[in-house]
Amino acid sequence: WDIHNEGTQPSVRSVTNRLDAERVAVREALGYGAPHFPLADHYATDGDEWMYGRKGHEQLVDSGDWREHIVLTEHRYMREDTQQGLAFLVSVADWAGVAAPTATGLLAIGSAICDDDFRSSGRTLERLGLAGLDRAGMTKLLAEGL
């Protein structure tokens, strides 16, 4: 499996573009403005260059350096990216009242694959003790930290 090859096919990209749009919507709901560093910029062939440059993606695919055997139920794509990152995104979207159907659906699929309810076991506002914050409290936390 190579995340930069098989993981970036057009059909997969359409899903990640929707997921990224939900991430940007959550950022905006929290009061963050641009730049949002959309993932699509990494694959763009025109416009402003992003942090990897125009040939970055092509060079990653051609290198073969990212090819790896994965045990999906144990891999970081599930246990870090989904259980921790996506669970957090979904919980913040819920808190902020932002629709995140792609993130929510992927979280449910990841939970089923791993036979683990990532909404319960993942990193969420609830598990961090932050779900009870009101808008002013969240704004203060984001500006000042704990």
Place the predicted regions along the sequence by residue.
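Substrate/ligand-engaging "lid" and interaction regions
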Residues: 1-19, 139-145
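Short, flexible active-site loops
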Residues: 1-10, 37-42, 67-74
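A broad "ordered helical/assembly scaffold" signature
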Residues: 5, 9-11, 22, 26, ...
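Small-residue-rich helix-loop
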Residues: 12, 16-65
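C-terminal helical cap and adjacent loop that interface with cofactors, partners, or active-site loops
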Residues: 47-146
